[in-house]
């Protein structure tokens, strides 16, 4: 499995039924092939070649998670166990979620198990041994609707209070772990950048918004609401910095030519801010890409779809800690200890410097050449 629950919708049933039907055809062909191959055993190699007869291939069966799911549920199974790669990935019930109500809540536990533990069980089944399995499963359902809340910190601009620079990360995480990286690494950097500017007595000319978004994992819900309801005028946003990836360190940023001089000025302090982490501003080469037409990826998406600049730092594992994002992405290893403290510290510095610098320009960033018009 890839982490998603079993699709028990009508579409899922139809996919499984099609696979079952195809497997019946494969079974028929395999029986014929086995009979043919058996007949060749009584023939000499010379006779086989003379008659042009060779062994037929035994075809593999098609696979699909819980192929006989509907039939097993009707037979009264108590649960499903699937083998999982380690670290175990769990994803939300994307295919079933729109069909769920309090009247048809899931009744069959869908268990993702370490593939090595699964193999022990599978071998016992193959040996036709009797055994019992016990799982302690604690799922709780609550009557909706469930409210989601964005948390927005506001540092009001002294000269251009109705113009904005934003930074953000998302508050929610998958329950399989604590979200220490996804997106604790983003939330903590945004909060620390806010603290640094405030403690330094910063008085930005332009308003800075420190955004902690709700519901990113379930469809960018918080940032989508913010953009679609024009919580602030989108044309007044200079840039939105999104942090939702590994706990790595900013070492450069690439910007359109029209923004290059501004970013060189704003990011100048970062070139010497830390001796271990050089920082460069790069001018984008070539033609701009098209404005995104669909949302995806992270909370920058709806801003970008509406033409708001969402330029972000290039992050690197500069000291070679060998961080692997896919090791933590929606897995049981997405915990606090996977963050890299020194990278987080410097990321906060970079974010604070960039936010404060853009907020203190005498103009919002020029969007010329940001996207292909």
Label the predicted regions.
Residues 59-67, 112, 116, 180-188, ...:
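Soluble non-cytosolic domains of exported or imported proteins
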Residues 62-70, 74-75, 138, 150-152, ...:
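Short alpha-helical segments and helix-capping/turn motifs at coil-helix boundaries
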Residues 102-105, 109-113, 120, 195, ...:
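His/Asp/Glu-rich mid-to-C-terminal helical/loop segments that flank catalytic regions of hydrolases
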Residues 159-161, 196-206, 230-236, 273, ...:
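Secondary-structure transition/capping motifs at alpha-helix termini
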Residues 1, 78-83, 110-113, 152, ...:
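Structural recognition of the beta-strand scaffold that forms the well-ordered cores
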Residues 5, 31, 110, 160, ...:
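Metal-dependent peptidase/peptidase-like ectodomains
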Residues 99-180, 192-205:
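Soluble metallo-hydrolase cores and metallopeptidase-like ectodomains found primarily
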């Amino acid at each position: 499995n890839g982490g998603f629950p079993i699709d028990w919708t009508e579409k899922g049933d139809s996919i499984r039924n099609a696979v079952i039907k195809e497997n019946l055809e494969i079974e028929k062909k395999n029986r014929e092939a086995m009979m043919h191959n058996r007949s060749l055993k009584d023939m000499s190699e010379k006779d086989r070649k003379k008659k042009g007869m060779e062994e037929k291939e035994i075809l593999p069966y098609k696979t699909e998670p819980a192929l006989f799911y509907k039939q097993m549920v009707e037979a009264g199974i108590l649960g499903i166990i699937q083998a999982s790669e380690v670290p175990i990935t769990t994803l939300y019930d994307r295919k079933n979620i729109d069909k769920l109500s309090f009247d048809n809540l899931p009744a069959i536990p869908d268990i993702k198990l370490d593939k090595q533990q699964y193999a022990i069980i599978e071998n016992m089944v193959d040996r036709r041994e009797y055994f019992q399995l016990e799982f302690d499963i604690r799922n709780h359902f609550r009557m909706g609707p469930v409210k989601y809340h964005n948390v927005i910190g506001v540092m009001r601009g002294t000269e251009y209070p109705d113009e904005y620079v934003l930074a953000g990360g998302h508050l929610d995480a998958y329950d399989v772990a604590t979200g220490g990286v996804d997106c604790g690494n983003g939330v903590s950097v945004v909060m620390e950048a806010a603290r640094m500017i405030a403690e330094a007595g910063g008085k930005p000319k332009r308003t800075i918004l420190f955004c902690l978004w709700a519901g990113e994992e379930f469809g960018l819900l918080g940032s989508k609401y913010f953009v679609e309801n024009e919580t602030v005028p989108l044309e007044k946003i200079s840039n939105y910095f999104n942090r939702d990836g590994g706990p790595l360190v900013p070492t450069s940023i690439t910007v359109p030519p029209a923004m290059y001089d501004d970013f060189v000025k704003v990011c100048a302090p970062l070139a010497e801010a830390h001796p271990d982490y050089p920082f460069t501003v790069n001018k984008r080469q070539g033609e701009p890409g098209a404005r995104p037409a669909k949302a995806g990826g992270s909370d920058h998406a709806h801003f970008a779809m509406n033409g708001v600049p969402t330029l972000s730092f290039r992050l690197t594992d500069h000291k070679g800690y060998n961080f692997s994002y896919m090791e933590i992405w929606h897995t049981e290893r997405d915990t606090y200890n996977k963050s890299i403290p020194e990278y987080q510290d410097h990321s906060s510095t970079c974010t604070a410097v960039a936010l404060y610098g853009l907020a203190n320009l005498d103009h919002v960033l020029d969007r010329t050449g940001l996207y292909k018009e």
